[in-house]
């Protein structure tokens, strides 16, 4: 008897389910994607016990005939591709025909579907992949799929499920991503009878962002767009002042499909340059329209990994789209909001709430650049759980707390902003410059700086030898003197480093530099990089280099320490990129040679520093991404002293401090 046998269909489906159905959120993803492919405009997701007990997806799509409903439970039966050539021009979200049979093989599944309104429909009941019941029923147009007792026949998989709160967080994250990918579809998510998420389905992406991340977040998103012969990019990214501690808020879409791609994520950060603090990430929703021939989605069972042709060109297109859009905005952070961030840290724990978007209650007016709402249509805010700055472990508590507390806040609530103070304190550490990983992150942001329009400032005072005070047409400005000079010196060194033609000064007494044998050998291999920045070291004896001339931008008294610093930097950097090395060197030198805190400046020096800052391409952030200055407007001052009162009915002031 042959040792090799053909597996039964049920067993094969259960094996496939191990790849396709990792957790309840995987079921939600596959079924909702099928509903979207069916042309649905309204999709309702109902779950109980975070999907382990029940998942029900109801849509108003085109539905299925009785014959198609039966075939849908067979492996590799699909209506989305018919030939080999179709595999290379896929525009649907699903195409393999694996999801439904895989899910049915590990659950009790009920399908109720009809192709026309008021006509006869089909009811199918399957258990463990076997159809146990089929009958004709009356059903509205569309499909309702009920999945119960998930993993009932694969108990080993249940052992690896996390808490109900964690599984719910994964479901909400999937629904949020799909809502952003398809703002033209109205999504409703209900857990244990409570409405968790609701989008309007108007097709306005910014409105979908407001429904998912909150109105205050949507107001701080800016639109981007760019295109070439192969790609068309559109979407929204957050202002540099609105960031998160991880990449979970970056949503990349290709032809309506949510994907994960490290290089494209990196291109988003490159578009911000040094405007982002190190360790902080923007909120971004970027939709990429591409010829299906240039994207291969048949890579991974979840279809979230996509191979893209001309990926480098796409990265450049995304970076330039973001940098061009940021040029149009005033990037000086509002000081009053910064104060609110630190004063509300204890309030900043609950997961963000949002409005239930009931068309046409909330809409975005592009001409006025603001949201407007009809008071009669505002419902109570609903809890909206997203994986906000949390690992899987910490999400559990936040979701649990939010479920227990419910959503009882009124629409005129002031939303607490998220705190970035911890990241700022980290930047001040001098140990920071010794970290190769941190340096690499910095350089990725500093490759391109954009010119800016800087306000005219009139200096009038200094506090604690650290902060400069100035006034202008925009109100009061407070400047961090160390960050300001660091920015000035960075741009100076960034420009001067590498200008080797006719810019070398002979040393009357050459310098000798000794290194360990291993460092000496490494430096010899990378000597061309030092020469590119104007440092010409020659071997001179055992493990020793001699320097006979130095670049004129480096003062002679700084040569010895400066060259050692450059060599240390070169030894720290494994990549042999001249561009990156010059940027790293400029960061290091600007930080070490800038005035520190508790250093008193006279009026002339302070005014000169502000004049130099105004000439910078990016005067708003130091090379590490920290803000150089903050602004109190006249209105902010009047609010603090209660000279004017907030308009409690104004939607524009919602969430403002």
From Swiss-Prot:
Molecular function via GO:
ATP binding; ATP hydrolysis activity; ATP-dependent DNA damage sensor activity; mismatched DNA binding
One Pfam family recorded for the sequence: HATPase_c_3
Q: Which GO terms describe its cellular component?
A: mismatch repair complex
Per UniProt, which keywords does this protein have?
A: DNA damage, DNA repair
From its record, what is one biological process in GO terms? mismatch repair
Encoding gene per record: mutL
Could you identify this protein by its name? DNA mismatch repair protein MutL
Q: Which family does it belong to?
A: Belongs to the DNA mismatch repair MutL/HexB family.
Free-text function comment from the UniProt entry: This protein is involved in the repair of mismatches in DNA. It is required for dam-dependent methyl-directed DNA mismatch repair. May act as a 'molecular matchmaker', a protein that promotes the formation of a stable complex between two or more DNA-binding proteins in an ATP-dependent manner without itself being part of a final effector complex.
Listed NCBIfam families: mutl, PRK00095.1-3
């Amino acid at each position: 008897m042959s040792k090799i046998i053909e597996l039964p269909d049920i067993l094969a489906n259960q094996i496939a389910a191990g790849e396709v159905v990792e957790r309840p959120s995987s079921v939600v993803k596959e079924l909702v994607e099928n509903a979207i492919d069916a042309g649905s405009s309204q999709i309702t997701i109902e779950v109980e016990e975070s999907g382990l007990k029940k998942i029900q997806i109801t849509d108003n799509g085109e539905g299925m005939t009785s014959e198609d409903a039966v075939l849908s439970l067979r492996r590799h039966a699909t209506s989305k591709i018919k030939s080999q050539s179709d595999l290379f021009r896929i525009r649907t979200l699903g195409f393999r025909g694996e999801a439904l049979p895989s899910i049915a093989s590990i659950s009790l599944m009920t399908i109720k579907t009809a192709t026309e309104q008021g006509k006869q429909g089909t009811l199918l009941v399957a258990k463990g992949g076997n159809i146990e019941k089929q009958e004709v029923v009356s059903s509205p147009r569309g499909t309702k799929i009920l999945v119960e007792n998930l993993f009932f026949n694969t108990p080993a998989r249940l052992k690896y499920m996390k808490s109900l709160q964690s599984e719910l967080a994964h479901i909400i994250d999937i629904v949020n991503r799909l809502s952003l990918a398809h703002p033209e579809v109205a999504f409703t998510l209900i857990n244990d009878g409570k409405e968790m998420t609701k989008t309007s389905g108007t097709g306005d992406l910014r409105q979908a962002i407001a429904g998912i991340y909150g109105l205050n977040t949507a107001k701080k998103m800016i639109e981007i767009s760019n295109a070439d012969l192969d790609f068309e990019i559109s979407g929204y990214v957050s202002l540099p002042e609105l960031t998160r501690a991880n990449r979970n808020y970056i949503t990349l879409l290709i032809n309506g499909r949510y994907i994960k791609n490290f290089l494209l994520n990196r291109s988003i950060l490159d578009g911000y340059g040094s405007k982002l603090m190190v360790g902080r990430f923007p909120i971004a929703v970027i939709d990429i329209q591409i010829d299906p021939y240039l994207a291969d989605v048949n890579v991974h069972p979840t279809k979230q990994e996509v191979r893209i042709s001309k990926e480098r060109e796409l990265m450049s297109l995304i970076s330039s789209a973001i940098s061009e859009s940021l040029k149009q905005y005033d990037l000086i952070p509002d000081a009053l909001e910064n104060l609110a961030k630190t004063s509300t840290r204890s309030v900043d724990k609950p997961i963000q709430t949002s409005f239930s978007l009931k068309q046409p209650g909330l809409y975005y007016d592009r001409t006025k650049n603001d949201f407007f709402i009809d008071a009669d249509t505002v419902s109570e805010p609903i809890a909206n759980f997203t994986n906000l700055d949390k690992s899987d472990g910490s999400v559990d508590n936040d979701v649990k707390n939010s479920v227990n507390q419910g959503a009882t806040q009124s629409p005129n609530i002031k939303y607490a902003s998220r705190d970035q103070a911890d990241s700022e304190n980290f930047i001040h550490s001098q140990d920071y410059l010794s970290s190769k990983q941190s340096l690499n992150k910095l350089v990725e942001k500093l490759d391109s700086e954009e010119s800016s329009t800087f306000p005219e400032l009139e200096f009038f005072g200094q506090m604690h030898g650290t902060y400069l005070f100035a006034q202008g047409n925009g109100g009061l400005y407070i400047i961090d003197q160390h960050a300001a000079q660091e920015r000035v010196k960075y741009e100076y060194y960034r420009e001067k480093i590498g200008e080797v033609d006719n810019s070398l000064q002979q040393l009357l007494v050459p310098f000798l530099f000794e290194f360990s044998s291993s460092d000496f050998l490494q430096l010899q291999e990378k000597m061309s990089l030092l020469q590119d920045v104007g440092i010409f070291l020659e071997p001179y004896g055992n493990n020793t280099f001699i320097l006979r001339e130095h670049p004129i931008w480096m003062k002679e008294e700084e040569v010895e320490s400066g060259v050692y610093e450059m060599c240390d930097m070169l030894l720290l950097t494994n990549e042999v990129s001249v561009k990156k090395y010059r940027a790293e060197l400029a960061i290091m030198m600007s930080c070490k040679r800038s005035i520190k805190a508790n250093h008193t400046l006279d009026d002339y020096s302070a005014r000169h520093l502000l004049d130099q800052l105004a000439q910078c391409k990016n005067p708003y952030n130091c090379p590490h991404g920290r803000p150089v200055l903050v602004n109190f407007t006249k209105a902010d001052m009047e609010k603090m002293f209660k000279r004017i009162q907030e308009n409690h009915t104004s939607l524009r002031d919602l969430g403002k401090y």
